[in-house]
Amino acid sequence: MAGSLSEIKAKINSTEKTSKITSAMRMVSSAKLVKSEQSARDFQIYASKIRQITTDLLKAELTSGSTNPMLVSRPVKKTGYIVITSDKGLVGGYNSKILKSVMEMIEEYHADGSYSIISIGSVGSDFFKARGMNVSFELRGLADQPSFEEVGKIISQSVAMYQNEIFDELYVCYNHHVNSLTSQVRVQQMLPISDLVAEEANDEGVVGFELEPDRDTILNQLLPQFTESLIYGAIIDAKTAEHAAGMTAMQTATDNAKNVINDLTIQYNRARQAAITQEITEIVAGANALE
């Protein structure tokens, strides 16, 4: 019985240590989430302005029958997917949701291999490579608060692959942050841009601009920058969802540890009570034997 009591006590101590670790990790994820949410809000100020300028310029461009390759849809022979996952685990179902969605799309639409994956995050890279899938580029070890300089190269490579007709449309697949408890899988088209902003560009109220040197030159510079800003925004959004998932997972782990501790404590008290009762019974029996 003594051995049983010591084993239960050891389990309680071990679970309490685990609970302290998961609680600390939850607090770290919570702090990261607050920073990511602020970064997302700050970025939206820039994103909304460049989207407004681009849309206003495209209103005239689309109606004039533009031939800009980033605006014009072409026959789709190959599709590019930027897939954003985490670099580490302990984030609940964050990675499994997006990877399942991507696999379903590829199995349904690209059984012939007419796709290319640009992977951001070690979990996704390892997942796709283990299955021998087409990974053109990868980025591992992304910071908790990624700067544009950190992700700029892989973003510009993705846009360049579309411009060079390595693939004919580009999507970004990621978890969109809704709140601290919820995220949604998003598969958002980035290129061609015409499909992305056509509805906005067809609205009335064109803003007049005096353009220097000319519209085409400006669009040739602006459209890649606009697309890159959309992709960067998706990365920030995905990171925010990752931190929220990590916080939720660690909170769940902490709660589960507390439940285990409560169950073990009850088990320990019952075993201790049984041991005391048995000891008293043995003492009484011994005393009776001496009479």
From Swiss-Prot:
Pfam families: ATP-synt. Gene3D superfamilies: 3.40.1380.10, ATP synthase, gamma subunit, helix hairpin domain (1.10.287.80). GO terms for cellular component: plasma membrane; proton-transporting ATP synthase complex. Its main location: membrane. PROSITE patterns: ATPASE_GAMMA. Keywords: ATP synthesis, Cell membrane, CF(1), Hydrogen ion transport, Ion transport, Membrane, Transport. It comes from the Bacteria. It is found in: Cell membrane. The keyword Flavoprotein does not apply. One of its GO terms (biological process) is proton motive force-driven plasma membrane ATP synthesis. Belongs to the ATPase gamma chain family. F-type ATPases have 2 components, CF(1) - the catalytic core - and CF(0) - the membrane proton channel. CF(1) has five subunits: alpha(3), beta(3), gamma(1), delta(1), epsilon(1). CF(0) has three main subunits: a, b and c. NCBIfam families: ATPsyn_F1gamma (TIGR01146), PRK05621.2-1 (NF004147). This is ATP synthase gamma chain. It comes from Streptococcus uberis (strain ATCC BAA-854 / 0140J). The lineage of its organism: Bacteria, Bacillati, Bacillota, Bacilli, Lactobacillales. The gene is atpG.
